[in-house]
Amino acid sequence: GVVIDIGEGVSKVRESDKVILTWIRSDGAECAGAKYQKGNTIINSGPITTFNNFTVVSENRCVKLPEGIPMDLAPLLGCAIPTGAGIIFNTIKPKHNNTLAVFGLGGIGLSAIMAANALECSTIIAVDIEDHKLKTAKELGATHLINNRDGGALDEILKF
């Protein structure tokens, strides 16, 4: 998004800066998540308040968008990539000869595929019900594809 206005003490971003909102805390001020009210319903929108046209966020949830990265790809940097790649690099930590299966090939799953490929996992199994997502997974490093539209993915995976 684009910074419309800043509050007192904000030094990390300026008005008109292009930014990525992320759930990963960085430096800068932290404040409570925003709340919105519609009639008698109060919505706690959390620390980054996504899916809005405008939002109020803590400075430490904004990262300036690096030059050369298009705005339409920026949202992937705030959630899908750190979640999908983060689970591979920081939690699973597979070795190059490990087999890994990823179920669901949205932004998070495809980011996990890319991370597993970067770690040179020998077998990366992509599972989804959409052929176009499986094709993308193959392009990003999946070694085996399973369309689970009719079930049976687990039986297929156990063959590896």
Show which residues each predicted segment covers.
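Conserved sugar-transfer catalytic core signal across GT-A, GT-B, and GT-C glycosyltransferases
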Residues: 87, 112, 133
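Glycine-rich beta-strand-centered segment in the early N-terminal region that forms part
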Residues: 1-28, 66-69
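Hydrophobic packing within well-folded, soluble alpha/beta domains
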Residues: 1-3, 13, 55, 65, ...
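Short, well-ordered alpha-helices that flank and scaffold nucleotide-derived cofactor binding pockets
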Residues: 89-90, 114-118
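Hydrophobic/small residue at the entry helix of a nucleotide-binding pocket
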Residues: 83, 108, 116
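NAD(P)H dinucleotide-binding glycine-rich loop of Rossmann-like/cofactor-binding domains
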Residues: 25-103
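Adenosine-nucleotide cofactor-binding segment
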Residues: 99-105, 117-160
